[in-house]
Amino acid sequence: RFGDIHVAASSKDENFTYIPRKFDIRPDAQYLHICTNNTIFGTRYNFLPKTDVPIVADMSSEILSRVINVSDYAVIYAGAQKNVAPAGVTIVIARKDLVDDKDNQLSCCPTMLKWSVQAANKSLYNTPPCFSMYVAMLVFRHLKKIGGVKAMEEINNKKAALLYDFIDNSKLFKNYVRKEDRSIMNVPFVTGNAELDAKFVKEATEHGLCTLKGHKLVGGMRASIYNAMPVEGIKA
């Protein structure tokens, strides 16, 4: 409905356990869309594809988790529900020329999803989700207090290193994602036995380690260690 989609790269050949390095970008492409962190398979982009095409990034599951160069992107958008606030708020960082380019806006795009409309109304075109925005403010203040996104990234790297090190040295658990492409937000792991996985999830829950069941598409286990998860939670 909104465009002619072409898949420029995929790691389906290895069950999405790595980030592809080769991209087949069509000459007529208007932008390249990437999801920088995959919550289901536990991968993330540690590089940007080399292209002259504007890059649009979905950072819903990792925004504010690490330092990025915003100017590398034409558009960054993110739902707030992972690292910022309760669901209801969406953050959009877009180049001004794209926001102002009314001539190339799709006529089929709903009015409230048009960035030019939202920008002209200072994000108040419709009644905003006030509580979610209030919580976002508190989160932003907290981040500034602890030293900003750089400090948060250091904490997240420490958390992820602790968990991956345990899994890699375990005789029971395994993570199949290539090390250079591992997410620091979502860590999937398995025993290799579905019944044992289910038993682990059940007994972990009984011991206060909750929501470790893997996504329904892949099974196994998954530890989502977003910004709100303290280092102590990993050590537990």
Feature locations, PLM:
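Active-site phosphate-binding strand-loop segment of PLP-dependent enzymes
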Residues: 10-63
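Active-site C-terminal subdomain of aminotransferase-like
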Residues: 80-165, 178
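A short linear hydrophobic-aromatic micro-motif
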Residues: 172-176, 208-214
